[in-house]
Amino acid sequence: MATNRNSRIDSKEFVEQFLSELKAILESDTFVIERDLDILHKKRNESATDPYTTTNTMAALEFDANDVCEELKAITVEDYAETMLDDRNEAAPPFFVFYRNIQTRYVYIKVKIRDRATGKVFCVSFHFARYPKPSPLPYEG
């Protein structure tokens, strides 16, 4: 079930297509993590002590950008929660939301392919789930 009017549940095939494209980009010989994977570490109004920020989650997991990239490659359709429109630009590619169990905790991941032609990926969220994971997820089990 989508969480708000800016979100939707895409078909399993559509999500699988997105994941296939994402994995192809991340595994491409031309993909350079430092240049092509944009991870938003802190949102404007987040507190530095908030355990649910991307920065603090990555620190708690002892992750760097390479580890985030590996987790993005490992996402499956069963991890899918919803698709969200980019509220800054509705014409831009949407974000796909996933929940992954990493080191016994659910991590909320919100990612999009920013530019397919140049292989740019934008991970706007990679943090411990602030709220319980919806259960079941659309294609879980």
State the predicted function of each range.
Residues I113-G141:
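Enriched for short, Lys/Arg-rich terminal
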Residues A2-E13, Q17-S20, A24-A92:
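Compact soluble domain cores
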Residues F14, F18, F31, F63, ...:
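Phenylalanine-focused residue identity feature
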Residues K73-K120:
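Functional cores of ribonucleases/endoribonucleases
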